[in-house]
């Protein structure tokens, strides 16, 4: 059985150990500082004698350090395992933040936690509610950051299953036998096998990032620690850049963007009207029934009333086509669809689609078929 040294010394970054087994999947050690995946927290990564391992997993009573190349190791070797501490500490902060948020949700707002996920960018907490007002979640953000500033102690207690059940925890206990209780002093108490910071102050900050519905429940989204700081800074840079781009004060960016969007809508309508007028004039001029158009094919649709037309237009590097005519005549084109590289269809008298051929080649080929 691997000695779980990460429980004894959560802040230990390196330790010596003996290799107990070597497998194609990785190494087993006599003891480790590397936390294995569990409880929504990903496994640690790092180096064993300078050789990187990418993950840490529970394998029964043993802990596997996932490694691509184990050829230099053998059972009995004494090795030094070193954590990717930045990665580990990031998830210690995030896991502690999750306990803090879930505890405050339950104690202050009566909201239970169903599941959690600690990702590379965000922390998510699925709640037992089908609806939560936005101002409740913003208040929760304030409460969490207040608790961070207060620096509540975080510590562990080991006790029997029956003792733990008598504590009235906010979630049921999922393990048999003795239970490890994580306590955020004055805030939360829960059974958990994860690794946490020693104080809420080490979380740094918590930022509410939104919510979404999943399985009929509200899932809340958060950023913590360095992630929250990085997002705050990137948002500030974005606002500053938009302010310069729109020549507007930071508090006027939204209004400036709305004006720009409205101008863009008006320009699109003006352009659409001009294209349709150009298409109308082109058709009225007695043009060839097969031609390449400078206007989008949609501009012709309001003006096609009679006759037969095959029109092409290239947009975004693709040859679009429009055929106005009878079902029987379109059947001639469909018969040669492979040769024409045609895709699309429709219903008489209007058919349209795209072709892999250039406009010039497509028009020449269609002219031969429909002549």
Region locations from a protein language model:
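A glycine- and charged-residue-rich anion-binding loop/surface
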Residues: 1-371
């Amino acid at each position: 059985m691997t000695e779980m040294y990460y429980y004894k010394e959560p802040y230990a970054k390196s330790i010596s150990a003996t290799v107990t087994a070597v497998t194609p999947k990785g190494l087993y050690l006599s003891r480790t500082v590397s936390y294995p995946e569990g409880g929504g927290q990903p496994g640690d990564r790092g180096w064993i004698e300078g050789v990187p391992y990418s993950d840490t997993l529970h394998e029964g009573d043993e802990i596997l350090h996932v490694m691509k190349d184990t050829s230099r190791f053998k059972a009995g070797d004494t090795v030094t395992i070193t954590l990717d501490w930045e990665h580990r500490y990031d998830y210690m902060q995030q896991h502690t933040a999750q306990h803090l948020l879930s505890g405050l949700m339950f104690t202050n707002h009566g909201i239970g936690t169903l599941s959690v996920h600690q990702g590379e960018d965000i922390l998510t907490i699925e709640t037992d509610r089908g609806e939560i007002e936005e101002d409740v979640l913003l208040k929760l953000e304030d409460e969490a950051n207040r608790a961070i500033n207060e620096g509540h102690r975080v510590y562990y207690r080991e006790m029997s299953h029956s003792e733990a059940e008598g504590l009235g925890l906010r979630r049921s206990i999922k393990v048999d036998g003795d239970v490890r209780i994580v306590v955020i002093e004055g805030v939360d108490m829960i059974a958990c096998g994860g690794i946490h910071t020693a104080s809420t102050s080490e979380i740094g900050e918590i930022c509410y990032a939104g919510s979404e519905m999943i399985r009929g429940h509200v899932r809340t989204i958060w950023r913590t620690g360095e992630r929250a700081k990085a997002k705050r800074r990137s948002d500030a840079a974005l606002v500053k850049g938009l302010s310069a781009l729109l020549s507007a004060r930071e508090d006027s960016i939204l209004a400036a963007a709305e004006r720009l969007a409205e101008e863009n809508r008006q320009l699109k309508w003006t352009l659409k009207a001009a294209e349709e007028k150009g298409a109308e004039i082109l058709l009225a001029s007695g043009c060839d029934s097969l031609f390449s158009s400078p206007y989008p094919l949609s501009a012709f649709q309001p003006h096609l009333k009679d006759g037969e037309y095959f029109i092409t237009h290239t947009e975004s590097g693709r040859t679009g086509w429009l055929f106005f005519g009878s079902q029987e005549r379109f059947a001639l084109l469909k018969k040669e669809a492979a040769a024409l590289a045609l895709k699309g269809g429709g219903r008489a008298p209007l058919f349209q689609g795209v072709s892999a051929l250039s406009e010039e080649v497509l028009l020449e080929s269609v002219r031969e078929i429909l002549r």
